[in-house]
Amino acid sequence: MKLLEEFIQEKGTVLPGNVLKVDAFLNHQIDPGLMQEMGKAFAERFKDLGITKIVTIESSGIAPAVFAGLALSVPVVFARKKKSVTLTDNLYTSTVYSYTKKKSNDISVSKQFLTDADTILVIDDFLANGQAALGLLEIAELAGAKVAGIGIVIEKSFQQGRELLNKTGIPVYSLARIASLENEEILFLEEE
């Protein structure tokens, strides 16, 4: 998606350790116009798959997921990283490791909001090592829900996440695919 690539080039920053900082439009401050276009792109890609719900992880996946949900006219469910007083029982839970934060988190979704009647689209902000998406796939499996596709905002194609997700047989679509972040230069793969 050319618009997203332009935002990444103009407002993204490469940090040591192949970290891409995109807090100017995705991870801290959100650009609603960009989110709307991303939502439309995900909807266009997955519109014929019978999606009944979109599932993501708090917090940076929520904005793109909501705009995709709006475009597809389906609800959005986000997995919580921390349990609250209102989210204690009847949960589907998976443990995911965050390479950016260097720690594992339990993510949970209420059984009330995900069932075997659902066909879901997983949406996440980044694909690097694939652990977040795999955790959401595990939750979907626990619920008996069908996963029709995985939508990624920014994919670091030089890491193993895509390869791991491809092994599941579930279609993966990334709006921006980064080939390299070496020498603080952002290089993209061609669009899918």
Swiss-Prot record:
Xanthine binds at L20, N27, K156. InterPro entries: PRibTrfase_dom, PRTase-like, Pur/Pyrimidine_PRTase, Xanthine_PRibTrfase. One of its GO terms (biological process) is xanthine metabolic process. Its EC number is 2.4.2.22. 5-phospho-alpha-D-ribose 1-diphosphate binds at A128, N129, G130, Q131, A132. It holds the Pfam family Pribosyltran. Coiled coil: none annotated. Pathway: Purine metabolism; XMP biosynthesis via salvage pathway; XMP from xanthine: step 1/1. It comes from the Bacteria. It is found in: Cytoplasm. One of its GO terms (cellular component) is cytoplasm. The keyword Amino-acid biosynthesis does not apply. Keywords: Cytoplasm, Glycosyltransferase, Purine salvage, Transferase. It catalyses: XMP + diphosphate = xanthine + 5-phospho-alpha-D-ribose 1-diphosphate. Converts the preformed base xanthine, a product of nucleic acid breakdown, to xanthosine 5'-monophosphate (XMP), so it can be reused for RNA or DNA synthesis. Homodimer. HAMAP family: XPRTase. NCBIfam families: PRK09219.1, XPRTase. Belongs to the purine/pyrimidine phosphoribosyltransferase family. Xpt subfamily. This is Xanthine phosphoribosyltransferase. It comes from Listeria innocua serovar 6a (strain ATCC BAA-680 / CLIP 11262). The gene is xpt.
